[in-house]
Amino acid sequence: MNRTSPDSERPPGSEPVWERPWSVEEIRRSSQNWSLAADAGLLQFLQEFSQQTISRTHEIKKQVDGLIQETKATHCRLHNVFNDFLMLSNTQFIENRVYDEEVEEQALKAEAEKSEQEKTREQKEVDLIPKVREAVNYGLQVLDSAFEQLDIKAGNSDSEEEDANERVELILEPKDLYIDRPLPYLIGSKLFMEQEDVGLGELSSEEGSVGSDRGSIVDSEEEKEEEESDEDFASRSDNDQNQHTTRMSDEEEDDDGDLFADSEKEGDDIEDIEENTKSKRPTSFADELAARIKGDMSNQLKEEQIADGKPQKTMKEKKEKRTPPDDEEDILFPPPKLTDEDFSPFGSRGGLFSGQGLFDDEDESDLFRETSRDRPAQAPVSEESSSPKPGKKIPAGAVSVFLDTSAPSLKEFQKHEQPTPGKNPHLPTPAGLFDDNDDDDDNFFVPSCNKPPKTDKVKSTSIIFDDEEGDLFREKPAPLPVASVSQADENTTRADKTITLPSSKNPKLVSETKTQKGLFSDEEDSEDLFSSQNSSKSKSASLLSSQLPTSGSLFGDEDEEDNLFGSAPAKKQVSSQQPQSQEKPKPSEQPKKKASALLFSSDEEDQWNITDSHTKLATDRKSKGELWDSGTIQGQEVKAVKKTNLFEEDDDEADLFAIAKDSQKKTQRTSLLFEDDDDSGSSLFGFPPASVPPATMKKESISKVPSLFSDEEENEVPSRVKSVDVKVGNGKEADVAKVTEKEGLLTASDQEAAGPSDLFSSSPLDKGTKGRTKTVLSLFDEEEDKVEDQSNTHVSKNDAEKGLKTDGRPKSTGVFQDEELLFSHKLQKDNDPDVDLFAGTKKTRVSVPLDGSLFGDDEDYDLFSSAKTQPVVPEKKGALKKDRPVSLKNEEAPESTEGSKEKSLWKAETPQDSSGLTPFKSREPSSRIGKIQANLAINPAALLPTAALQIPGTKPALCELAFPSSEPGRSHGPESVPTLAGSEEAGVSFDLPAQADTLHSANKSRVKVRGKRRPQTRAARRLAAQESSESEDMSVSRGPVAQLASSPILPNGHQPHLQPRMASGEISSEKAMAPAAPPWESGPALSAVDRSFFVASLPQTGNEADLFDSGDIFPKSIGSQSMEGTKVKAAETPAHLSGGSKEKSLVFPALSEASSTDDLFQTVKPRPAKKRNPFPLLEDEDDLFADRKGKKNELKSDSHQDIISKTQDIFEDDIFATEAVKPFQKKREKERTLEPNLFDDNIDIFADLNVKPKEKSKKKVEAKSVFDDDTDDIFSSGLQAKKSKPKSQSAEATSELRSDHKVSNIFDDPLNAFGSQ
């Protein structure tokens, strides 16, 4: 039945009932008749219902999610609204808070007043009276401080402050803001660099004191009184304000104008310095300051300004109170005194001490600075200041407090010690007042006032950068050494200039010259100042230890001591490290850098102190000018050190002083360098040499730094030096001579003193080896170029520096660039006797790098210029003996490229040298000026065979120019090689300024160009090595001549040394004459060598053709240069012996040209053999260095004798002759023994020489090879051959020199040259 009913029901569904979902009704109907169909239908129903439920749930979920999203969005909007309200409320809160404070206070006041109005209208008036009085007093103070009352009586007529009518009647003129607000220091000035406030902070502090008296005290009183009056109308505000106003009214009412009288007086005293107290003091201060400070108007202005700011109410109240102590000179009050007027006595410190009773703590830091500073300088100043105006000077103030309390002994020491040095008391007076004051505020003034005081300034600035800690102790030792310096009164005359300078500078020199301690007992004492601390300990240990300890102290010690030793010993190290820099280039650089870092870390003072120590070096260089060799070495070291410092300061100080210190230390130190150069450069070279010396300095620094860096290369170099030593079996003696010579370079005077050699024999023997190694490093292409620039730079620089020292003594260049420059100039001036050596030597040396040879050549020239410049070739040969075929050729190729440029440098240097050596320059420029231009055209591109003919006329002329223009040019021969690079832009015959400018820019550009040339030299080494094998075959027959030709290259590199040696020792000149003249007469090799020397004058076409065939254009050019250099050398050797080196150089060029003119070209043949010789040249170059150094020692000893007479010519002649003697013999032996190697080296050399840019270097190398054959002839031929040509071959030079330049054409196209052979 159920089934039936379902079935009956199913048909209407047209489908089985069990297959479709049943409805609820169906389920209910069939509930009684349940069947399987009902189960199926129920299942279907349930499934459908489940699906619907699920779908429904999903829909609800979606809706819920949408709701959540809406809710979140609403939440965000709500929060945004909250944030808006918060922002609004905060803004309104801030605004309301401001308004609320004002409104509430006013409301409270109004309420209180209203509550009390009935009671206290009278009280209110009484309460208002103090306020009104304060307001009036403040207003009057403002009028007094800010305005000058033209109508004083009208203002003073009213006894009551409240009367404003007559005040209105007052004619008020606003005061000059810059009375109270002085202008900042000159930008870039020492003070500007040293002081963070650049002179404004002190005055702001003074104004702060002034303003603090006016403003801070007045404002604080106003605030206090207003607060008190607001809080307690009748209580303190009435009492205090009434008392305050009573004081003011006593001043104002009693005077009726004390407000105005004070205004008048203060207006007047602002001008005068204060009211009665100030007017009294300022007159005495102004008188004392005018008497003592003399030059320090700005200090007085600052004092007056500070005082002007202070004649205010506090001036009246507190300063009147302070006035008695100020007058009394009480140590109790000196800081307040400083605030009032004691800063004005120390007007320069005025900022530091100036208004700063308030800022005594700051001043005390400065007091300690200046206590330490003033203790050296200000102790006498405090004596003088305390004696004439004890209260005011002691306010140096805090100085009296600290000096009297803690530093009376310092004061006494320095009073006695510094007054003991004649200059020191003179220095302390200005320096004590101003030199130390404001660190260097008065250094501007001090330079004029205290350039001799540079000792004090050195102390003070050294102490300044050693400011507080190191200074007190350092200065305490410093006064003791000064005492011992004053004990060494013999040296105190010099030491007075160098007393403190030796302290800061002589540590350098002491480290350089321990025997110079004996030379300069002051330096020992001053050294003891520093050696007491670190310096003499490290100095006693050794220069190396001194450099390491000094470097250690530079690094280990405080910046202060490090600066003393970092700047001074760092420079010592630099000077001694020029040899040592090879051992410790990085320590010296690190000391320099740390000195530079200290310069930055220890403030600008360190910088200045480094500059001071540089200046000290210059000063001691001059004070030690008797040891003018070391003086020049020091000068060059000073420049080298300064330059190194410049460069390391460029590295380190490039931050603050890359502009400031670079512009200052460079500009200033460079100014020192430059001003030494600029001052003398302006006179001797104009400023262009000064400009050149900056670049020169930079290059020196760079080259020296490379030398320092070349220590890295030294590792290579020692191995090469080993080979050099192997080759230099004889050369080791020469190397020892080199070492001694480099020692002499660094301590020319030391070696003259014989003890300095011990300085360097202790460390410089190692240094000598490393100096030789460094020379070898200099031989590296990098250093070759840089060293050539450096030697060029040093030639021009040392020449400029010496000429500058000679002419720069008047310190014509910017005093403000560096007071120390001024000081260094004055100190150099002060050391005029030595400077006379420098003067003669400088100018002469400018002409005749005697100093350049001894120093420029010994140190900068021998090590860098000759030893390095030539070592650039020779040392590279020594260092690169193994690599030398490449290195020498690289060198020679860069030198060839540089050669033309360096010949221009020779020219440029020749103008410098021409001052002393004008005859050569004068003789040759006529033929040379055109030739110089042709020489300029002789750039490596111009050196092509086609251009070679022009170039031969030009290049010999250039070599002649470089050398004859200053046969010191021969001494500059080594110098000239770098000088050619340096002087590329300026013709030798051109004016010195052009040289300086040319050298300046040329050095900069050439450093870069050389950097380019070095790879060229390397590439040229390979090319030249290939082609040199061809030319080697050519040159094998010419081996001795080629050695001679190569030797002249060494003369190019080393001739300066030979000449300085000859200059130093005419004996060596005679020796050089003996080998030089006999070689002319002696064996064919000698004649060939002499001919190679004389190639410039009469190159034998056959041999010259051989030169061309051999590709020895460079040998020819260089050989002719070297030959002519040797010829001129030989000529000048008798000339030097006769004292008419120029005349005899003219004579010998004629003789040499006549006798060996034919041989000149034969020598040109040997120059093709130069290709063989370069390795012998390497050996011989080492020998040259050894001989050079040994001869430099001779030259150093004899250079003093010959410096004055013929520093230029003698040095050139002697350098060549002297070098010609020893290296000539040794290198003849070596050439004989090493000619096969020479040929091998010639191959490599010409591989180097193949590069056109390095043609001249190649010539130099070949000249060195000639030097191997005949050392005398080598140098003469390398440097003098062309010089002789311009002399004898002025007419012949064009044709014959062109034939020489046919050889040059080979060098012009090194590849073609070899191919053209």
Swiss-Prot record:
Motif placement: LFa 6: 599-611
Residue ranges of the motif LFa 3: 464-473
The keyword Protease appears for this protein: no
Region annotated Interaction with phospholipids, chain positions: 912-1317
Keyword set, alphabetical order: Cell membrane, Endosome, Membrane, Phosphoprotein, Protein transport, Transport
Biased amino acid composition, Polar residues: 500-518
Residue window of motif LFa 16: 1238-1246
GO cellular component: cytosol; early endosome; early endosome membrane; plasma membrane; WASH complex
Assembly behavior: Component of the WASH core complex also described as WASH regulatory complex SHRC composed of WASHC1, WASHC2, WASHC3, WASHC4 and WASHC5; in the complex interacts (via N-terminus) directly with WASHC1. The WASH core complex associates via WASHC2 with the F-actin-capping protein dimer (formed by CAPZA1, CAPZA2 or CAPZA3 and CAPZB) in a transient or substoichiometric manner which was initially described as WASH complex. Interacts with VPS35; mediates the association with the retromer CSC complex. Interacts with FKBP15.
Motif segment (LFa 7): 646-657
Recorded name of the encoding gene: Washc2
Organism name: Cricetulus griseus
Region ranges (Required for interaction with F-actin-capping protein subunit alpha (CAPZA1 or CAPZA2 or CAPZA3)): 1004-1022
Motif (LFa 10): 832-838
Region described as Interaction with VPS35: spans on this chain: 349-1317
Single annotated GO MF: retromer complex binding
Name of the protein: WASH complex subunit 2
Motif position, LFa 13: 1147-1161
